[in-house]
């Protein structure tokens, strides 16, 4: 995604925020909303990683507490030409992962316990390579800023509906227009998230496949995570749906209306794109849908396949 398009999308989110402010407090409300949006962006720039990681109860690990995971991240970060990010684990049964941080020097990769327990080493490597691709593409800051502003738009819109908006406009079309904008603004914010997310996910899939060297490792992981997301709820994501687009697979994808406003491209389309990429990069990797565990005989193996599979998320 070009920097110009990204800037325009973020400007659109800010304009929605100002529009809600205007409906609540007139011109002064719009000005306050602009100042608040600017302050939020500055605050998010410096605190984005701590905010999101704290929200999901992520715990930082090192080579002593999670040696296999940390070594895998270090190996893949080296292949990607990135500094070593901090590594976190979230105690959550849904297999999923995200990356955050304002730049590659201050990045973090977080995975759930469900991801480590349900995926093979090769699939896990594909997921981590995908998240490192987000870091390399500088997507991590954009994802967090978008989530922050979109969440604020929803919150302020609900506040405006509760208090009835700007009372000077509370008759005739003014009231109808105010209510319409307060209802539609959060939907508009979701559409902006979709526009950003769809493009960056395809790009991260391709770069992640190149980093790990086997597109089918990531393709297999995507299929497994997508199936689990329809069955295993992510309670923290339910409480903060504006952060759903940060994950490799939408953690809300099995929940009603979220399918109509999906923040991610179709998983099947992503898998198909990775299958096409296999011919260019070479190697078939793991077959989609196979049980988690070591690579089958004859399939390309990762540097981590020679060791026994870890029994828990910390090994």
From Swiss-Prot:
<protein>
    <recommendedName>
        <fullName>Protease HtpX homolog</fullName>
        <ecNumber>3.4.24.-</ecNumber>
    </recommendedName>
</protein>
<keyword id="KW-0812">Transmembrane</keyword>
<dbReference type="InterPro" id="IPR050083">
    <property type="entry name" value="HtpX_protease"/>
</dbReference>
<keyword id="KW-1133">Transmembrane helix</keyword>
<feature type="compositionally biased region" description="Low complexity">
    <location>
        <begin position="288"/>
        <end position="303"/>
    </location>
</feature>
<dbReference type="GO" id="GO:0004222">
    <property type="term" value="F:metalloendopeptidase activity"/>
</dbReference>
<keyword id="KW-0378">Hydrolase</keyword>
<dbReference type="InterPro" id="IPR001915">
    <property type="entry name" value="Peptidase_M48"/>
</dbReference>
<feature type="binding site">
    <location>
        <position position="130"/>
    </location>
    <ligand>
        <name>Zn(2+)</name>
    </ligand>
</feature>
<feature type="active site">
    <location>
        <position position="131"/>
    </location>
</feature>
<dbReference type="Pfam" id="PF01435">
    <property type="entry name" value="Peptidase_M48"/>
</dbReference>
<keyword id="KW-1003">Cell membrane</keyword>
<keyword id="KW-0482">Metalloprotease</keyword>
<keyword id="KW-0479">Metal-binding</keyword>
<comment type="similarity">
    <text>Belongs to the peptidase M48B family.</text>
</comment>
<keyword id="KW-0862">Zinc</keyword>
<feature type="region of interest" description="Disordered">
    <location>
        <begin position="282"/>
        <end position="315"/>
    </location>
</feature>
<keyword id="KW-0472">Membrane</keyword>
<keyword id="KW-0645">Protease</keyword>
<feature type="transmembrane region" description="Helical">
    <location>
        <begin position="172"/>
        <end position="192"/>
    </location>
</feature>
<dbReference type="GO" id="GO:0005886">
    <property type="term" value="C:plasma membrane"/>
</dbReference>
<dbReference type="GO" id="GO:0006508">
    <property type="term" value="P:proteolysis"/>
</dbReference>
<feature type="transmembrane region" description="Helical">
    <location>
        <begin position="145"/>
        <end position="165"/>
    </location>
</feature>
<feature type="transmembrane region" description="Helical">
    <location>
        <begin position="16"/>
        <end position="36"/>
    </location>
</feature>
<dbReference type="InterPro" id="IPR022919">
    <property type="entry name" value="Pept_M48_protease_HtpX"/>
</dbReference>
<feature type="binding site">
    <location>
        <position position="134"/>
    </location>
    <ligand>
        <name>Zn(2+)</name>
    </ligand>
</feature>
<keyword id="KW-0997">Cell inner membrane</keyword>
<dbReference type="GO" id="GO:0008270">
    <property type="term" value="F:zinc ion binding"/>
</dbReference>
<feature type="binding site">
    <location>
        <position position="201"/>
    </location>
    <ligand>
        <name>Zn(2+)</name>
    </ligand>
</feature>
